[in-house]
Amino acid sequence: MSATIRTGLLGGSFNPAHGGHRRISLFALQALRLDEVWWLVSPGNPLKSADGMASHEARYRSALEQARRAPIRVTAIEAQLGTRYTVDTLRTLRGRYPRREFVWLMGADNLATFHRWKAWRDIARTMPIAVVARPGYDKDAIASPAMAWLRGHRTSAAEFRSRGRWSAPTLVTLRFDPDSRSATAIRRADPDWPSRYRSGLLFDQVTHRSIFGEREPPA
C-alpha cells in the first residue's frame, strides 16, 4: 500500500449483502485505484422502515461471506461509535484515520434521494463521492437536487486517480455494466435467509473489537 491508504466506503443495510455489492466494490477498487474498500454495515437507516430488516449480526455475517478473498473489510463501526447519520460517521472516520484518504461510494439510487439525507452538502464537503450506475435510477439521479449542486464538481475517474491529494466536494461517475441483483429480490425469494447464520463472537475487521457476543472469561 502507498503511504496514504486510499479507501472506498460503501455504507448500507446489507439486508442481505450480495454479489452486486462485491462487484461494485471490486470495480471501484480498479477504476479509482483504491487500496481497499470498507463495508459499513449500518445498525439502522433513518430513511428506511425497520420492517423486514434482519438483525445487525445476520447482515454483518452476510457481508463477511460476500467479502471473502477480496480487499474488502467489513465493519460495524457505526454501532460502536453510536453515530446515527452518515455525516457524523464520515467526519469521525476522517479524524480517527488521518493516514487514509476516503471516497464515499454510492449507487445512482442513493444519489437520486441524497438531498433527503441529513446535512448532505456537508457529506459532500467531507470527502469525494463516487456514484455507480444502477438500473432504472440514472434519470432520477441526473435530475436530482443533489446532482444540480454537485454538477460543477464532476470529474472523470482518470483525472481523479491522477490527483496527488483528493479534495471535496468532488463527484466521480463510474460507468460499467449495471448489476441487476438486489437485496429486495433476495429477501422475496428467501425470506428466511438470516437463519443460515449462526450467532457468536466476531471481531470487527476495521476496529478489531469484539462484536455480537461475549468474550469468554480467561481460564
Swiss-Prot record:
<dbReference type="InterPro" id="IPR004821">
    <property type="entry name" value="Cyt_trans-like"/>
</dbReference>
<keyword id="KW-0520">NAD</keyword>
<keyword id="KW-0808">Transferase</keyword>
<keyword id="KW-0548">Nucleotidyltransferase</keyword>
<comment type="similarity">
    <text>Belongs to the NadD family.</text>
</comment>
<dbReference type="GO" id="GO:0009435">
    <property type="term" value="P:NAD biosynthetic process"/>
</dbReference>
<keyword id="KW-0067">ATP-binding</keyword>
<dbReference type="Pfam" id="PF01467">
    <property type="entry name" value="CTP_transf_like"/>
</dbReference>
<comment type="pathway">
    <text>Cofactor biosynthesis; NAD(+) biosynthesis; deamido-NAD(+) from nicotinate D-ribonucleotide: step 1/1.</text>
</comment>
<keyword id="KW-0662">Pyridine nucleotide biosynthesis</keyword>
<keyword id="KW-0547">Nucleotide-binding</keyword>
<dbReference type="InterPro" id="IPR005248">
    <property type="entry name" value="NadD/NMNAT"/>
</dbReference>
<protein>
    <recommendedName>
        <fullName>Probable nicotinate-nucleotide adenylyltransferase</fullName>
        <ecNumber>2.7.7.18</ecNumber>
    </recommendedName>
</protein>
<dbReference type="GO" id="GO:0005524">
    <property type="term" value="F:ATP binding"/>
</dbReference>
<dbReference type="GO" id="GO:0004515">
    <property type="term" value="F:nicotinate-nucleotide adenylyltransferase activity"/>
</dbReference>
<comment type="function">
    <text>Catalyzes the reversible adenylation of nicotinate mononucleotide (NaMN) to nicotinic acid adenine dinucleotide (NaAD).</text>
</comment>
<dbReference type="InterPro" id="IPR014729">
    <property type="entry name" value="Rossmann-like_a/b/a_fold"/>
</dbReference>
